[in-house]
Regions:
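Structural preference for beta-strand elements that scaffold enzyme active sites
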Residues: 3-6, 14-16, 42-44, 76-82
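Catalytic domains of carbohydrate-active enzymes, especially glycoside hydrolases
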Residues: 27-49, 101-106
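Active-site mouth loops of central-metabolism enzymes
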Residues: 9-30, 80-99
Length: 106
């Protein structure tokens, strides 16, 4: 039997689509842990409006949230973020070094 591989985007796109990305990390990390225990091994964990909403609306640091996400799922789970093309996580185009930095960090 072939395995179907998929990526869970609910912790980025789901929050962004329904709640305007305004969800506190402490409120959803238990769900991340449960999803990981259920066997999900690939998550989209940030980027897009989620990155800036943490700073502007939640008073949280996006990098701290990503560190916590990694801690909860462990080292063997694949994480990725959404980049807005050449804007990366900003609202305006970014220079090449910023695009590369985003790719290297996330």
């Amino acid at each position: 039997m072939k395995k179907i591989k998929f990526q869970d985007t609910s912790f980025r796109d789901g929050f962004q689509s329904i709640f305007g990305a305004r969800v506190f990390a402490k409120d959803f990390m238990p769900a991340v842990e449960a999803a990981c225990k259920a066997g999900i091994t690939h998550f989209e964990a940030g980027g897009g409006a989620r990155f800036q909403a943490l700073y502007q609306n939640c008073g949280e640091d996006a990098f701290d949230m990503m560190d916590e996400f990694r801690r909860v799922v462990g080292p063997n789970v694949r994480l990725q973020t959404l980049a807005r093309g050449i804007n990366v996580v900003a609202l305006a185009p970014q220079p090449r070094d910023m695009i590369k930095l985003h790719a290297d960090m996330f």
